[in-house]
Every structure is written in structure tokens, then in C-alpha cells.
From Swiss-Prot:
Gene: CYP81E8
UniProt binding sites for heme: C436
Membrane-spanning parts: 3-23
Localization in the cell: Membrane
UniProt cross-references to Gene3D superfamilies, sorted A to Z: Cytochrome P450
Naturally occurring in which organism (per UniProt): Medicago truncatula (Barrel medic)
Annotated protein name in UniProt: Cytochrome P450 81E8
Membrane topology: Single-pass membrane protein
Length: 499
């Protein structure tokens, strides 16, 4: 009899717990944004075709400007409206200031402790402060100006040598990647890693490093199914975790080597490592080697590809629209003339050139879904309930093509930015406290590179055919095919440095 009552009490206890969980859960998931039917266990993962922002665009046409998906057991909400995106990063900015954790963050991002992956809180705030003051402040960016100028001039010289005797076909992508990569690498460590004229004494070291970065970029992204289906991780069926473990060891050893070189060898130069090692001397408990390596990784991964793909898209659009290229050239000829090269401080006086950069960022945002955010508590958005631990993605690609916001939204028309306030509708660098801290640096690099490319050369397409504008599948939305074009040095331009 006692056993009977005991079993009854235990059963009732479990029934109450189950009902409580059920009611809490269903209340929690009541009034969610609409979304497609999902399958047991995998949710909507089977529907996620690359590029993801295109799939989300199709889904938003059916389910609206805010919809829900299930990535395995994780709820994902996708926003495709500027007003709702602004609601995310004003009223709900703190609730959405966390990041979801992915396998790449665990292995490459020092267990999600870097500034790009770290949860919102004191640690993240400190890292943002270090990044803003020690590396990306206007003062520091000015002190790194010579590096940027030198790398861009190397690119200009290379093109000038190739095309001095007339129109010559050039492949631009590797040159843009070399330039942005060397710029960031020199800011970080003082070393040039790319190109025939790289100054790394150990060529093997340069080769190894290029391999590391290529692999890290290919493993990044928020669409590894193993991130959402925990049980797949136990089997590591695609070997992703094993590859990430291996690559993280190589990356760490490489970055540690760079720090040690500065610690035990050449100090007192203007590099990020040296500035951080100086801070380490006074505050060793905070400025650990791991913090420094995390900042190096973020600078290299967030700051290189993003800028080079933007420059490649801008040039592709200019080649498809010679009248825009001509207008930009006239602006440069009028304001700068033929006797000197355009410089970074001129860019603010060249509104049309700036508008070309904005228009490129509108149509070809390098991070079309920004970077995923995570809600730290339940909140409401666009009239729906969003539970804690929801992954939020903003489809900037769609918002930048919204016909209610932009006239002829798919046309490349820099003139649209002549209207005051238009630039405030851009989401290319995100909004709110987790917005991109590298915006100023990237706009300086893009403005100067494009300015010099337009000022110093004549450009045309290889044939009649327009440049193919199809997007690749990688984490940064680059062009699928590498950009080749015909270029010729502009003879009226008497610039000794270039020739
Ligand atoms: C065209 C160039 C670039 C574009 C389009 C771009 C875009 C973005 C976007 C959309 C985000 C996420 C914002 C969000 O979470 O809502 C981001 C974050 C970030 N970007 Fe950039 N970025 C560019 C260049 C750079 C550069 C040059 C650097 C640094 C050298 C940089 C460093 C970062 C960092 C550290 C974060 C993470 C911020 C955080 O989580 O607190 N980015 N970027």
C-alpha cells in the first residue's frame, strides 16, 4: 500500500512538472513571428540553401518582414524591415547585444572570448575599449596612414608597370586581397605577408600563414549544421570539429610566435602588438597573451576580406557604368588636378566618390546578414513575442533593396546619396552597441583605393559583355568570379611616384 501511495505521489509530481513546463513553454512560444512548417529534429535546416540571404528573401516574401525558423532546436528570427531592425538596435539593443556561440568561435575565437563573439558584459566592453583606443581611434588610424598609403601605392605601381604601354588585362582580386591583408597585417605586426615582394624573411612562414587564413575563412559562418544539431557533434560526421581543432592549434602557435618576436626582439615600433605589450607591462592580469591573440584574429578575419570584396564590387559596378566612372574622374580632376595624387584627407571633399562607396555598401554589403545576435531575455519585436536565447538575423541585403526605401533599388545610382539623410538608411556596418568598430578604417581604405584607381588609370571591360555580378557563397558576400579588366595608365597624369 505504501508503495502504491509513493508511486502515486511521484507520478503526480512528474505530471505537475510536465504540465508546468508545457504551459510555460507554450506561453513562451505564443505569438511568435510566422514561419514555414518545420521537420522534427532538424527544423528548417533542410531549407537553408546558400547564399542564405537569398533564401531568407524568398521566405520573407511569403511570411513577411519578420519570420521564424528552427535551426534544429534553436529558434531563429529573421528581420527584413528597416523599422524593425531599428527597433532591434535602439529599444532592444541591450537585450540583443549577445552573440550565439558557434564551433568556429569555440576553436578560432578562443572559446568565444574575442570582441566579436564575447557575450555582452564587462569583458566585451573592455575589449571594445581597447580596440577603439589602441587600434581604431582616429589618432591611431592617422598614425597608420603611411602603411595604408604605401600598400595602396604598391597596388597602383604594380598596375602602372603592367599597363604603361597601353590597355592590358589585369586580374584585380588577388591585388585587392594582398593590399587589404598586408595593410592590416602591418598594422598588427609590422610584416607584409602577401605578394612577391613580401618582406617576411621566412617564405615558409608566409605560405603557412596564407594557408591558415584561407582555411579559417572557409570554415566560418553560421550555417554549419553541427552547430545546431548537437547530436551530430558527437559523431563529427563531416570532420568539421577535427579540422577546427587542428587549425586553431596552428593559428595560436603562429600568433604566439608573432607576439614573442615583438616581446623578445624588435620593440618600440608602431604596431598593435607593441602597443598591447606596453599595456601588458602595466596591467599583466588583463592584457594577457590570449587577449592580444584574440584581437589579432578578429582584426585579420573581420578587417581584410570585407574591405577587399567591397573594392572589387565597386570596380565591377564602375566598369559596368562608364558614365559613373567618368563623373568620378571629373570630380577628381576638378578638385585634385593632375599634379598630385589624391590623398586620404581629400576624400571628405569628394562627395561623388563617397557616394560610390555608399552605393557599393548598399548593393553589396560584405556581411549581408550582419553578424547573428542572441536575445538575453524575452522581449517583443514588431508586435511578436521573442523568447530568450533566440538567434536574430537582420537581412540587410533585402532592406537595402526595399522599393519602399529606395527608388530603382537594384540600380547602381550613387546620386541617390546626394539627398540628405539617405546614408542613415544603410545597415552595412550594423547598428547599436555591437555595430562594426572598423567602419572608419574601411571607408578610408576604400575611398583612397578607388580614388587612386580612378585618378591614375583608364578602365574598360575586356569585351562588350557586362561584368558578371553573381555572388559567391562564402561568409563575406564577394563576387563569384574574380574581376578581370583592361587598364591603362592615364598619360596626362604626371605623377613621378607612380611611374
Ligand atoms: C567593408 C568593410 C566592413 C563591413 C561591411 C563590416 C561589417 C560589419 C558588420 C555588419 C558587423 C556586425 C554588426 C552587428 O553585429 O550587427 C561587423 C562587426 C565587426 N567588425 Fe566589421 N565590417 C567591415 C570592416 C571591418 C574592419 C576593417 C574591422 C577592423 C579592423 C572590423 C571589425 C569588426 C569587429 C571587431 C566586429 C565585431 C563587433 C562586436 O561584436 O562588438 N570590421 N562588421
Amino acid at each position: 500500500m505504501t508503495t502504491f501511495y509513493l508511486s502515486l505521489i511521484i507520478s503526480l509530481f512528474f505530471l505537475i512538472i510536465t504540465l508546468k513546463v508545457f504551459f510555460n513553454t507554450s506561453r513562451k512560444f505564443k505569438n511568435l513571428p510566422p514561419g514555414p512548417q518545420c521537420l522534427p529534429i532538424i527544423g528548417n535546416l533542410h531549407q537553408l540553401k546558400q547564399p542564405l540571404h537569398h533564401t531568407f528573401h524568398t521566405l520573407s516574401q511569403k511570411y513577411g518582414q519578420i519570420f521564424s525558423l528552427w535551426f534544429g532546436s534553436r529558434l531563429v528570427v529573421v528581420v527584413s524591415s528597416l523599422t524593425i531592425a531599428q527597433e532591434c538596435f535602439t529599444k532592444n539593443d541591450i537585450v540583443l547585444a549577445n552573440r550565439p556561440h558557434f564551433l568556429t568561435g569555440k576553436y578560432i575565437g578562443y572559446n568565444n572570448t574575442t570582441v566579436a563573439q564575447s557575450p555582452y558584459g564587462d569583458h566585451w566592453r573592455n575589449l571594445r575599449r581597447i580596440l577603439s583606443i589602441e587600434i581604431l581611434s582616429s589618432h591611431r588610424l592617422n598614425s597608420f596612414l603611411e602603411i595604408r598609403r604605401d600598400e595602396i601605392m604598391r597596388l597602383i605601381q604594380k598596375l602602372a608597370q603592367k599597363s604603361y604601354n597601353g590597355f592590358t588585362e589585369v586580374e584585380l582580386r588577388p591585388m585587392f586581397s594582398e593590399m587589404t591583408f598586408n595593410t592590416i597585417m602591418r598594422m598588427v605586426s609590422g610584416k607584409r605577408y602577401y605578394g612577391n615582394d613580401c618582406d617576411v624573411s621566412d617564405v615558409e612562414e608566409a605560405r603557412l600563414f596564407r594557408g591558415i587564413i584561407k582555411e579559417v575563412v572557409s570554415l566560418g559562418g553560421a550555417n554549419n549544421v553541427g552547430d545546431f544539431l548537437g547530436f551530430l557533434r558527437w559523431f563529427d560526421f563531416d570532420g568539421l570539429e577535427k579540422r577546427l581543432k587542428k587549425i586553431s592549434k596552428r593559428t595560436d602557435a603562429f600568433l604566439q610566435g608573432l607576439i614573442d618576436e615583438h616581446r623578445f626582439g624588435k620593440r618600440n615600433s608602431n604596431t598593435m602588438i607593441d602597443h598591447l605589450l606596453t599595456q601588458q607591462q602595466s596591467q599583466p592580469e588583463y592584457y594577457t597573451d590570449q587577449i592580444i591573440k584574440g584581437l589579432m584574429v578578429v582584426m585579420l578575419l573581420a578587417g581584410t576580406d570585407t574591405s577587399s570584396v567591397t573594392i572589387e564590387w565597386a570596380m565591377s559596378n564602375l566598369l559596368n557604368h562608364p558614365e559613373i566612372m567618368k563623373k568620378a574622374k571629373n570630380e577628381l580632376d576638378t578638385h585634385i588636378g593632375h599634379d598630385r595624387q589624391v590623398d586620404e584627407h581629400d576624400i571628405s571633399k569628394l562627395p561623388y566618390l563617397q557616394s560610390i562607396v555608399y552605393e557599393t555598401l548598399r548593393l553589396h554589403a560584405a556581411a549581408p546578414l550582419l553578424v547573428p545576435h542572441l536575445s538575453s531575455e524575452d522581449f517583443s519585436l514588431g508586435g511578436y513575442n521573442i523568447p530568450q536565447n533566440t538567434i536574430l538575423m537582420v537581412n540587410a541585403w533585402v532592406i537595402h533593396r526595399d522599393p519602399n526605401l529606395w527608388s530603382d533599388p537594384t540600380c547602381f545610382k550613387p546620386e541617390r546619396f546626394e539627398k540628405e539623410g539617405e546614408v542613415n538608411k544603410l545597415l552595412s556596418f550594423g547598428l547599436g552597441r555591437r555595430a562594426c568598430p572598423g567602419e572608419n578604417l574601411s571607408q578610408r581604405t576604400e575611398g583612397l583605393t578607388l580614388g587612386l584607381l580612378i585618378q591614375c588609370f583608364e578602365w574598360k571591360r575586356i569585351g562588350e559583355e557586362k561584368i558578371d555580378m553573381v555572388e559567391a557563397k562564402g561568409i563575406t558576400a564577394g563576387k563569384k568570379t574574380s574581376l578581370n579588366a583592361m587598364c591603362k595608365v592615364r598619360h596626362p597624369l604626371k605623377i613621378n611616384d607612380v611611374f
